[in-house]
Amino acid sequence: MTTQLNINSVIENAKRVITPLSPISIFAARNPWEGLEADTFEDVAKWLRDVRDVDIFPNKALIESAVARGELDESVFNQLVTDMLLEHHYNIPQHYINLYIDNIKTLKDVPASYMNHSNVDVVADLLLEKSKRDMAESYHHYDVRPMSDAIIDEQGEPLSEQVNRQMIKWTKLYIDQFLSSWTMPKREQSFYHAWLHLAQHDHSFTKAQRQVIKGLPNDPKMTIESVLNHFSIAQEDYQAYVEGHLLALPGWAGILYYRSQQHHFEQHLLTDYLAIRLVVEQLLVGDEFKSVTKDCESRSENWFKQTVASWCYYSDMPSDVLLQHDVNEIQTFIHFAATMNKNVFKNLWLIAWEMTYESQLKQKIKAGHESVAGALDVNQVNVTENDNANQSHSVSLNATQAVDENNSELNQVGTSTKAQIAFCIDVRSEPFRRHIEAAGPFETIGIAGFFGLPIQKDAVDEQFKHDSLPVMVPPAYRIKEFADRYDMNVYRQQQQTMSSMFYTFKLMKNNVMPSLLLPELSGPFLSLSTIVNSIMPRKSRVSLQKIKQKWLKKPETKLTIDREFDRTSDLPVGFTEQEQIDFALQALKLMDLTEAFAPFVVLAGHASHSHNNPHHASLECGACGGASSGFNAKLLAMICNRPNVRQGLKQAGVYIPETTVFAAAEHHTSTDTLAWVYVPDTLSALALDAYESLNDVMPMISEHANRERLDKLPTIGRVNHPVEEAQRFASDWSEVRPEWGLAKNASFIIGRRQLTKGIDLEGRTFLHNYDWRKDKDGKLLNTIISGPALVAQWINLQYYASTVAPHFYGSGNKATQTVTSGVGVMQGNASDLMYGLSWQSVMAADRTMYHSPIRLLVVVQAPDFVVARLLANNEHFARKVSNHWLRLMSVNEEGRFKSWI
């Protein structure tokens, strides 16, 4: 029992190296390093380079591209290098240090000829022999790696590749529940038991290997322990060994991790997976592991050779000259080369890139407020800053204070505003909001797209229920969509007719005899569909929508807002009256909308439209778990229109005028249009005027927003009709890049809208409304940081990882992806499950970067004590900042910027 508990603990701790991977149909951004944030970003980068040869720093080409585009100021980098050298003293001639730094900072690789030079071997052996204990251990420590990584097969590849192919085959078979007619036998018992049953008959194993499988224990934990003992792995190395196996196929391991969290009967899936993988490794390795030299020693020896070669190359000191020095001097040189390795300079380039963006963002805010200050006849805005030092910055933003100095002025602004539109914080809403505000007396607001409603939605036009909230939070309520009984019966019949047609097609395709007839039966129709979709994608989509509207028109629906009893539901259905009041109050506070209500308040979720796109869900609302957020917007708008809710809000200190009406809409990010989801039948005169005014200017807004967005797409030249072109892109099934999604996201600003209003943030910023003056205890800020900001960081790091290490964290080329098992994409039929973003989502061309891989900059508009309190109360966020997983900056009421590093 003690051993089994130990195995459980090992697996539980080892899960830190992977992240749960949701099916592609409900794709939600995940931070691939969330479980590793107890360590610094730099330490994790070094560890990943050691154990998987994965580099998570921007490479030389990305750095050079950033410099060429003006995104990275070289002077900032040079200052960082100077500051670093001043912190250390080395007893080395200065000209060697200068040569070394000048060469290594270009990130050029050491030529192979240096590694293969005999003198380098001599120096490395000398150091390893004389200084092994105090140098190899202090300079470099390697985790134990899977045995199969150290054995090379007859084809010249690590034996672990054969292990991977076996695991891909078996995991695909287990995961697939919907695409194949036959599922894996005995899968209902467990993955491990189903594999035991089938592997005994798998002739890819030898007869002797199949006999070993027959004799395996029924308990996967016992199997894991048996294999680890067979390989003589020390107990203190169990976790590192298991981590190596999880990192071998992080995609397939990730989907199993996700399923283990979703279903109680699959909670031990990772244990089953590891037991199978370790057995396969044992069978394929056989007795060869006995002849394998100690991996750590050989890697330490190789590390010495690399470090010696680096010193000789970058310092321009020939190896024969190096040999003329005594051992102590050589140790000093190599210590310097080890300390000042290439990863150190990659990290400095990354920091300089981030500091450059931080400086440019402050300059944008400064320039924006200078223009506002001139218009309001307030004091001139002065900026004094030392960007290279990256310390506190002083910017006098008197314009902000002039705009919203007190509540009376805020109320005055509110009465002149026709409509207030609350958008999701998604970076794609920033340009759209800017164009709306420029088009008339409209005010925009930023809030997470789930609008603070922890719900699971049960929509009439969706086959499955969906958790419509951030993936790190479980739903607490279920909201059902329903219509009049007659309308629902008609709609259900239409749905069944359509689904039966698709089911019949699938059934024929997956069975031997009927599949022979299928080409003749479906060929003419599918050929015509292919031609029309290829030649006239936009018209084809419009025609399809008309047919769908005629034959499968969704009826007018209502929502189960009030609490209902449903014995079939594992969640409460609907809200109590007090819960409705509480959620409305919380949402309004998060929007910083508790006074000065406009006559018309629109809650705008967002959705994306694309055709033939497996990663469609990645373009939807991240705060709603990879789905459109119009459902949440409609629910909150309906709640806020209820008289009893308004009465409760009034008692809580929030008065909504009777003339104010809430409505819901969706911002379609691929076409930059606003589609109405819910507009009450009765509008006040002022609300009706605002509604009509907004509709009148929306075509112009859409044209401007689309033109700005399409100009950034690499395959488009001059656009004369941006709206039509955007619709064509969204309809074209051959288009690999219907929109950029959240590429280039870089910052998350939490503050009053006046801080950034009218400033072109280039669609790179998440914008969340917040007023620290109304948040006395800091709970609102903590909520924003723990929810929306966390989602934004996950999105940011997924884009980052997919850019810097696309082979490991991305999903490859869209044109060669294969949708597999209904859960994700592969490259070919024997790759890992690709769980990141495609190449086209982050790159403009094969060698042209689009997304800028920098860590998220969180900006909080609040005094220092508010930010200090946040860091003291939120240890999870404070750790992200201190371990360099994101950057934090604040701006106080006097306009002084401060970097919290």
UniProtKB/Swiss-Prot annotation:
Family: Belongs to the inorganic carbon transporter (TC 9.A.2) DabA family.
The protein, known as: Probable inorganic carbon transporter subunit DabA
GO CC terms in record: plasma membrane
Function: Part of an energy-coupled inorganic carbon pump.
Source lineage: Bacteria, Bacillati, Bacillota, Bacilli, Bacillales
Residues at which Zn(2+) binds: C424, D426, H606, C621
Self-association state and partner proteins as the record states: Forms a complex with DabB.
UniProt entry tagged with the keyword Lipid metabolism: no
Organism whose genome encodes this protein: Staphylococcus aureus (strain MRSA252)
Cofactor(s) in the UniProt record: Zn(2+)
Coiled coil: none
Subcellular locations according to the entry: Cell membrane
Membrane topology: Peripheral membrane protein
Molecular function, one GO term: zinc ion binding
Signal peptide annotation: none
Keyword terms of this UniProt record: Cell membrane, Membrane, Metal-binding, Transport, Zinc
